[in-house]
Each structure stands twice: as structure tokens, then as C-alpha cells.
């Protein structure tokens, strides 16, 4: 067989594999549609068939004012690796409106220790495999994938256009960008794009030894951007795939990555739904369970010109005025005191009947009962006195006589 025949046979084989892959994709998409129909509105009804009942309970508990607003939000996740895949999974389960995924790597068996992918997805692009799984988990979420490296010139322009015009409404920017990449060059690309369009974003990462991680909330002009305080040591012009071929490999723990992803999504939800306090910087050290928090101020000599521009804009903005809290005199919560509860100062002198227990209220409410009734002080005293008196009435001689007669 000639070389041409071998190539033609290889082409036929690859075409058959491609058709089989397309068929499998269509089957999985049909299976995802059969899993459940799309839900138009989130409901707080507590039934087994409602996937949002536990999320909507946050409203009932006054944690979130309107949880369903999450369907109006668009989040971009850059990097679908150890942290990014878990982040995308959590956001999908939370019911985010639209999820945009960026990555150019493929799923490998070496990823199985930390990603939510399955071994049968090895060889697929990470964004494609993630989209399949996430669509099956929650078909209500709109998922958009981009399989390219954002650090190249052409792809950076595409990335810039996507994050600035692919919001929930066409032509609007995304609501939040989550950086889950593992290299300096990609972080700087995200930083430059967000500074240029003044977009808030979270940076995240896990250390090379897999025992520490962090998240950082970056608001251009208000907090330090990634270029304001870059790492002390940076490896430049090195492709990660080259390091893999040379046997260089960083450690990874699914626990550390899961914790970091949890912190990332938790703060993203607080930012998107306006509840709680969003951490500007939150670290995690697994060796001693240390969680440092801090706020990093922008560098007035930052190398990023857009960062300097955002700093000037922020300085000219009027400072938010803190609302004065009006002190209102507290009124009694209950008009009646059914249980006879009284507050006594610690230094109050003891009264004569301080040791006398209060009478037990038998009627404590419908559906409740007392397990037992404690004896009163007077009853205990009478019982002790009776026992003592009974012992004194019988003399020792009488007891001896009774024993001899037995």
C-alpha cells in the first residue's frame, strides 16, 4: 500500500470517527432536553421536582431580596481547569442566566483528579465537554463557548469584543468576569481587557504545591489591578504544554481547588445579588487553616495606562455618603408577660425567697408537654424531716428485740 492509499484510509477513518462523535453529541443533547423541560420562572414551592426550591429559600430567610434576578446576569469564566470547571458547575446549579466559557485546552486523563469531567470525555475540548455536562445539569442556563487562547493578538480582540458586548442584552457587557487561569500571561490579558472597558472581575489561583489558594476582587481604579502588584518571579515566553512534555508538573488537590472555587462563586453571588460583604482579597492556607483578608490599593505608578485612567476617574467620583443610622427607642417586644420572666441585675441583693423555685406552668402551649415536674423546695424539706423523725422513733433495744425474734 502506497503512502497516498494510507493517507486516504486514514481520512476515511477520521471521517467515520467524526460522524460518530457528531451522533453522540446529538444524542447527548437530546438526552439533556429529555432530562427536564426549561423552567420559565423560579418557584419557591417545596416539591421534589423543583430544582430551585432550596435557592429560593434564601428569600424566605431574608438573605437575598430577589434571587430570581440571577437569571438576568451573565458571567464569563476564563479557564475551565481545576478551579474554573468547578466554578462553572456551581454557577450552573445556582441558575445563572448566561455562562460564557473560555479555554483552548483539551480534557486529559491526568485531569481526572480535580475536574468534573469524566474519562470518556478525554480528547474533547474543555469548553465543549463542559457545555455538554452543564447543559445536562441545568438546561435553563445559556452556555456560550470560545475555544481559543486569549493571549494572542487576534484572539484578544475577540475576547475584548465578547466580554464587552455579550451580556444578557445584546450589545451590553457581561456582569462579571471570573479569572481561573493558571499563568501570568493570561491574567495580564484579562487585566488589560477589564481595565480598558472598566469591568469588575475576580482573579483566583492555587499555589504550585496545592496547599494554598486565593481570590481577589478587582474594581478598576478603586482597588489594585493585577499589574499594580505583579508577582516577584514570572516565567515568560514558556508554553505550559512544553513543561508537561519535559516532565514538569505542579501538584493539585481537588480539595484546595474546590475551596477556592467555593470562595470565588460565593463572593460572585454576593456581588451579583447584593447581599453580604464581598471580600477584596481572601486567601487560604491549608496547612494551618489560615484565611487572610485584606484590601489592595491601586498603584499610582502602574504600568497599565488604562489603570491610571481608571484611577483618575475614580478620584473624581463623589464619595458615597454614609447614611446616619437613626436610633429609635426600643419598645417591649411582647405586651404581656405570660411566663412571668423577669430580668435581675447581677449585683442585685438576694431576696429571702430567692431559692424558692417558681411554680411550674403546666400549660406551655399546644403540642408541648413537660417531661417531668420538679419537686418544690418545701416538699423536699418535708420529706427529709419525715425520714429523720421515723428513724428517731425506734430505739436500739426495740431493734435488737425484733432481730432476736426473727
Curated annotation (Swiss-Prot):
Listed GO biological process terms: protein ufmylation
Keyword Acetylation appears in the UniProt entry: no
Signal sequence segment: none
Active-site residue list: 249 (glycyl thioester intermediate)
Highest taxon, organism lineage: Eukaryota
Disordered as annotated region, ranges: 373-397
Molecular function terms from GO: ATP binding; metal ion binding; UFM1 activating enzyme activity
Binding site residues for Zn(2+): 225, 228, 302, 307
UniProt-listed InterPro entries: D-isomer_DH_CS1, ThiF/MoeB/HesA, ThiF_NAD_FAD-bd, Ubiquitin-activating_enz
SUPFAM superfamilies: Activating enzymes of the ubiquitin-like proteins
Keyword flag Metal-binding: yes
Compositional bias per record (Low complexity), positions renumbered to this chain: 378-393
One Pfam family named in its UniProt record: ThiF
GO cellular component, one term: cytosol
UniProt KW keywords: ATP-binding, Metal-binding, Nucleotide-binding, Ubl conjugation pathway, Zinc
Annotated family: Belongs to the ubiquitin-activating E1 family. UBA5 subfamily.
Protein name as catalogued: Ubiquitin-like modifier-activating enzyme 5
Species this protein is from: Drosophila willistoni (Fruit fly)
Amino acid at each position: 500500500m502506497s503512502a497516498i492509499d494510507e493517507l486516504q484510509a486514514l481520512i476515511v477513518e477520521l471521517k467515520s470517527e467524526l460522524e460518530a462523535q457528531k451522533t453522540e453529541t446529538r444524542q447527548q443533547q437530546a438526552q439533556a432536553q429529555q432530562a427536564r423541560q426549561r423552567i420559565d420562572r423560579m418557584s419557591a414551592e417545596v416539591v421534589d421536582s423543583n430544582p430551585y426550591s432550596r435557592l429560593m429559600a434564601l428569600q424566605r430567610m431574608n438573605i437575598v431580596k430577589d434571587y430570581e434576578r440571577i437569571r438576568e446576569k451573565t458571567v464569563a469564566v476564563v479557564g475551565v481547569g481545576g478551579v474554573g470547571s468547578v466554578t462553572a458547575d456551581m454557577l450552573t446549579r445556582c441558575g445563572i442566566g448566561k455562562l460564557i466559557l473560555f479555554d483552548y485546552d483539551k480534557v486529559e486523563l491526568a485531569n481526572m483528579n480535580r475536574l468534573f469531567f469524566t474519562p470518556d470525555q478525554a480528547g474533547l475540548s474543555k469548553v465543549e465537554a463542559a457545555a455538554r455536562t452543564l447543559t445536562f445539569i441545568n438546561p435553563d442556563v445559556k452556555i456560550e463557548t470560545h475555544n481559543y487562547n486569549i493571549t494572542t493578538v487576534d484572539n484578544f480582540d475577540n475576547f475584548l469584543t465578547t466580554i464587552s458586548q455579550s451580556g444578557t442584552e445584546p450589545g451590553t457587557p457581561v456582569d462579571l468576569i471570573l479569572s481561573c487561569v493558571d499563568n501570568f500571561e493570561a491574567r495580564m490579558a484579562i487585566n488589560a481587557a477589564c481595565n480598558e472597558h472598566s469591568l469588575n472581575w475576580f482573579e483566583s489561583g492555587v499555589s504550585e504545591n496545592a496547599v494554598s489558594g486565593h481570590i481577589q476582587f478587582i474594581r478598576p481604579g478603586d482597588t489594585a489591578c493585577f499589574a499594580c502588584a505583579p508577582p516577584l518571579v514570572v516565567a515568560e515566553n514558556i508554553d505550559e504544554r512544553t513543561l508537561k512534555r519535559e516532565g514538569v508538573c505542579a501538584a493539585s488537590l481537588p480539595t484546595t481547588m474546590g475551596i477556592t472555587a467555593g470562595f470565588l462563586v460565593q463572593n460572585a453571588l454576593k456581588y451579583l445579588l447584593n447581599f453580604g460583604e464581598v471580600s477584596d482579597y481572601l486567601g487560604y492556607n491549608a496547612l494551618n487553616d489560615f484565611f487572610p483578608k485584606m484590601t489592595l490599593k491601586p498603584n499610582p505608578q502602574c504600568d497599565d495606562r488604562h489603570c491610571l485612567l481608571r484611577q483618575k476617574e475614580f478620584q473624581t467620583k463623589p464619595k458615597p455618603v454614609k447614611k446616619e443610622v437613626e436610633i429609635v427607642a426600643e419598645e417591649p417586644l411582647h405586651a404581656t408577660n405570660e411566663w412571668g420572666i423577669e430580668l435581675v441585675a447581677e449585683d442585685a441583693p438576694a431576696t429571702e425567697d430567692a431559692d424558692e423555685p417558681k411554680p411550674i406552668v403546666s400549660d406551655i402551649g399546644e403540642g408541648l408537654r413537660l417531661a417531668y415536674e420538679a419537686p418544690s423546695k418545701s416538699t423536699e424539706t418535708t420529706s427529709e424531716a419525715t425520714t429523720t423523725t421515723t428513724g428517731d422513733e425506734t430505739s436500739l433495744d426495740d431493734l435488737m428485740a425484733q432481730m432476736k425474734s426473727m
